[in-house]
């Protein structure tokens, strides 16, 4: 355990950030899973709607600093290819 006051504060803020980041990543996985299930069921409308929602969540994660912009771009590209293949 840290003895320095600023380090004690950093431990608390890092834990808050870790929990927040894990929650955002979990939402992303759920959104991408929704796109994949819609693609598997060959439902174009549901897949398109899920793609929009997932893209929005990926962009939000980038703006919050949870994901790198290239990582989000790769994920969006992958799910877009699946939806466009329908």
UniProtKB/Swiss-Prot annotation:
It comes from the Bacteria. GO terms for molecular function: small ribosomal subunit rRNA binding; structural constituent of ribosome. GO terms for biological process: translation. GO terms for cellular component: cytosol; small ribosomal subunit. InterPro entries: Ribosomal_bS20, Ribosomal_bS20_sf. Binds directly to 16S ribosomal RNA. Belongs to the bacterial ribosomal protein bS20 family. PANTHER family: 30S RIBOSOMAL PROTEIN S20 (PTHR33398), SMALL RIBOSOMAL SUBUNIT PROTEIN BS20C (PTHR33398:SF1). NCBIfam families: S20. This is Small ribosomal subunit protein bS20. It comes from Arthrobacter sp. (strain FB24).
């Amino acid at each position: 355990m840290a003895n320095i006051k600023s380090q004690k504060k950093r431990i608390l803020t890092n834990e808050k950030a870790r929990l927040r980041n894990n929650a955002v990543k979990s939402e992303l996985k759920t959104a991408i899973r929704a796109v994949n299930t819609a693609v598997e069921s060959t439902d174009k409308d549901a897949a398109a709607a899920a793609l929009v929602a997932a893209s929005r969540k990926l962009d939000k994660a980038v703006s919050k600093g949870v994901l790198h912009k290239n990582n989000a771009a790769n994920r969006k590209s992958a799910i877009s290819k699946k939806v466009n293949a329908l």
